[in-house]
Amino acid sequence: MIREERLLKVLRAPHVSEKASMAMEKNNTIVLKVATDATKAEIKAAVKKLFEVEVDTVRTLVVKGKVKRHGQRIGRRSDWKKAYVTLKEGQNLDFIGGAE
């Protein structure tokens, strides 16, 4: 069993993009920014506990940070992990909450 403190640290934020909103509409999939050391099992448990929905599958990828310049200085943004969480049929989760 995964401790509750760990579950709260696994999920960082929803990832809002055009592709993410299309995935939510078509495939009942939510896109989340998660901790880089989070496993698929931890992500599934965290979504299930925090949002009280049934999870079907979890797919993850690591987004590599871009090299950016500020004047002459060259820096690099941090790598981060993204998770595509597909909910089971009949489950619904509305992050954006459009006007009704």
Curated annotation (Swiss-Prot):
InterPro entries noted in UniProt: Nucleotide-bd_a/b_plait_sf (IPR012677), Ribosomal_uL23-like (IPR013025), Ribosomal_uL23/eL15/eS24_sf (IPR012678), Ribosomal_uL23_CS (IPR001014)
Protein family according to the UniProt entry: Belongs to the universal ribosomal protein uL23 family.
PANTHER family the UniProt entry points to: 60S RIBOSOMAL PROTEIN L23A
Keyword entries, A-Z: Ribonucleoprotein, Ribosomal protein, RNA-binding, rRNA-binding
Function text: One of the early assembly proteins it binds 23S rRNA. One of the proteins that surrounds the polypeptide exit tunnel on the outside of the ribosome. Forms the main docking site for trigger factor binding to the ribosome.
GO BP annotation list: translation
Name the record gives this protein: Large ribosomal subunit protein uL23
Pfam family, one: Ribosomal_L23
Keyword Transmembrane assigned: no
Subunit structure: Part of the 50S ribosomal subunit. Contacts protein L29, and trigger factor when it is bound to the ribosome.
Gene Ontology CC: ribonucleoprotein complex; ribosome
GO molecular function terms listed in the Swiss-Prot or TrEMBL record: rRNA binding; structural constituent of ribosome
